[in-house]
Amino acid sequence: MSRFTGSTWKVSRRLGYSISETGKELKKRPYAPGQHGQRRSKLSNYGIQLQEKQKVRFVYGVSEKQFKKTFLESAKMQGKQGENFLKLLESRLDNVVYRLGFTKTRAQARQLVNHGHILVDGKKVDIPSYRLAPGQTVQLKEKSKNLTIVKEALEAQFAHVDYVALDANGVGTFSRLPERNEFLFDINEQLIVEFYNR
C-alpha cells in the first residue's frame, strides 16, 4: 500500500482522531465526512483494532508496508512490544525534524528530509525512515533555514517534547527515547498488537 496523499482532515474525521495532533480537524465537524457521517456504526473488535492501527499509521504518514516492517522489528526487542513499536516510530528522522519544530507537520518534515535539507551528526541524510539513536544531532543545512516552511514553523515556536533539545545555534539533539506517557496519549497500542497477532 502506498503512502496516503489525500485530505488529512477527512481521515481525522473518519477516524474520530486528530492525526495532526492539533484537534483542529474535529472542532467544527466532529463526525465522519459524507452524507451519513453523523451516523457512526458500531465497530466489531476487528474494526476497533484496525481503526487504532490506522490512527497511528496516518499520524506518522507511513505506508502499510513500512508500518508492518517496524512492528515486526519491535517484536525482537525486550519489553512491551506495543510500547517499543511506538518508540521506533517516534525515533524516525522525519518525526524528530517535526518534533524539533523545523516544520509544522510531519509531511513537511518528510519533504525536507527527502530533498536533502537535513544533516544528522553533520552529514546529509535523505531517508525519512532513518532511525535516530539517543545523542545524535539533527540540524538544517545553512541555506535551508531560509525556506518558507521552515521560517513559518520556527516563528510559530511550537513547544518541544522533553526528549528532543534545540540549542541557540539551531542544532537539535534526540536526547533519549521517549517514555510512553510523553506522546500519543490517546492511543491504545495493545489493540495494534492484537490486530497483527490475530
Swiss-Prot record:
Pfam families assigned to the protein according to its UniProt record, in alphabetical order: Ribosomal_S4, S4
PROSITE patterns with a match to the protein in the record: RIBOSOMAL_S4, S4
GO biological process, one term: translation
The entry's keywords: Ribonucleoprotein, Ribosomal protein, RNA-binding, rRNA-binding
GO molecular function: rRNA binding; structural constituent of ribosome
Location of the region described as Disordered in the Swiss-Prot/TrEMBL record: 26-45
Function (record text): One of the primary rRNA binding proteins, it binds directly to 16S rRNA where it nucleates assembly of the body of the 30S subunit. With S5 and S12 plays an important role in translational accuracy.
InterPro entries, A to Z: Ribosomal_uS4, Ribosomal_uS4_bac-type, Ribosomal_uS4_CS, Ribosomal_uS4_N, S4_RNA-bd, S4_RNA-bd_sf
Superkingdom of the organism of origin: Bacteria
Protein's recorded name: Small ribosomal subunit protein uS4
Family affiliation: Belongs to the universal ribosomal protein uS4 family.
Matches recorded under Gene3D superfamilies: Ribosomal Protein S4 Delta 41, Chain A, domain 1, RNA-binding S4 domain
Record HAMAP family: Ribosomal_uS4_B
Assembly description: Part of the 30S ribosomal subunit. Contacts protein S5. The interaction surface between S4 and S5 is involved in control of translational fidelity.
Disulfide bonds, paired cysteine numbers: none
Cellular component per GO, a single term: small ribosomal subunit
Residues covered by the S4 RNA-binding domain: 91-154
Keyword Ribonucleoprotein: yes
Keyword Ribosomal protein: yes
